[in-house]
Amino acid sequence: MGCNFCKKKDYVRINYIAPDEKEIVLKDYSSSNDEPLIIVESTKNYFTQVQLVDFVNLLEQFNLETSGIITDEPMHSDFSSNDEFLSKSFTLEEFLSFVENKILILDDLSNSLEKNNIIIFKQFCGEMYKALESKLKDYHKEENSFNLIKKRNILAFGILFCDCENIEKIKLFFDIFKNEDKKEIFKSKELNDFLITLFLISSYCLITTRNNITNEDKGIRKLGKEELLNLLKTSELKNCENLLKIFNNTFFKKESYNWNDFKKQFEDIDNGFGWILFSRGIRRKLEEN
């Protein structure tokens, strides 16, 4: 069974605060093709509809040799038609270039972010990349056997950069992780555990930080640079065993998966894991662990 949001009828929902009610078309800035990669439709709720394959197409611009491998058809969970592309690697510098030139352009954040916030956000991206690289090196045991991150290993991580509403972001990962048939990128228990940890921490960091950027009038407390970096240090699995246990026991070890049950667990601050949405809660939990 493939992941639900990879099916043809589904799409990634991205929260985009549009300046007006008109349709916004985001051009592919690095392609000679005149057709836009992503069409953004501004609605009264300012939701945009972007297929997952469009996100992959943005990544594809890193390597022109893969041109044409990604088709107009949405991706399937086994990534079988995209193996050549997804097996490509890219460096930290290339990834940060993607963050700056693609993600910031995509979300139109460059006009709303203060220079210091952009630096912190890029540093956050870099730290997450290096944490994933370190974990993958440990998994492959040999120091030099995995010095570049495969695109297939960072695909799910990249979705976190879409500025979704909180519950919409979590729904994407619910649809990924709930499937037993995890195929390539989730077949390793060690890597899957690490991605779960990454999901918990980075979703908290990104939701808190980026909601603050676009919702300053709502009184969301800023996440300081030092606090953000301290949270990133917990990306090492050895420091997150209790965190993983909480998450696994309340959701992933169940025989059946129901979105409404998961939503309740996620929003339950005291007995679930809704605490990751609040800075005081995550600090308390991390201190306990």
What residues fall within each predicted segment?
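EF-hand Ca2+-binding helix-loop-helix modules
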Residues: 3-141, 151-179, 188
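A glycine-rich, coil/turn loop motif that links secondary-structure elements
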Residues: 142-144, 184-185
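EF-hand and EF-hand-like helix-loop-helix modules
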Residues: 42-43, 55-60, 95, 110-132, ...
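A positional/structural detector of protein chain ends, strongest at the extreme C-terminus
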Residues: 1-4, 287-289
